[in-house]
Amino acid sequence: VVGGDECNINEHRFLVALYY
C-alpha cells in the first residue's frame, strides 16, 4: 500500500477493499 498501511489503517482497509 502506497504511503504505509501502518500510518493510516483506515485508508489501508479502504484500499484493500478496492484491490480485492
UniProtKB/Swiss-Prot annotation:
Keywords: Blood coagulation cascade activating toxin, Glycoprotein, Hemostasis impairing toxin, Hydrolase, Protease, Secreted, Serine protease, Toxin. Optimum pH is 8.0. One of its GO terms (molecular function) is toxin activity. Strongly inactivated by diisopropylfluorophosphate (DFP) and to a lesser extent by tosyl-L-lysine chloromethyl ketone (TLCK). Its EC number is 3.4.21.-. Its main location: secreted. Thrombin-like snake venom serine protease. Releases both fibrinopeptides A and B from fibrinogen (FGA and FGB) to form fibrin clots. Belongs to the peptidase S1 family. Snake venom subfamily. This is Thrombin-like enzyme okinaxobin-2. It comes from Ovophis okinavensis (Ryukyu Island pit viper). The lineage of its organism: Eukaryota, Metazoa, Chordata, Craniata, Vertebrata.
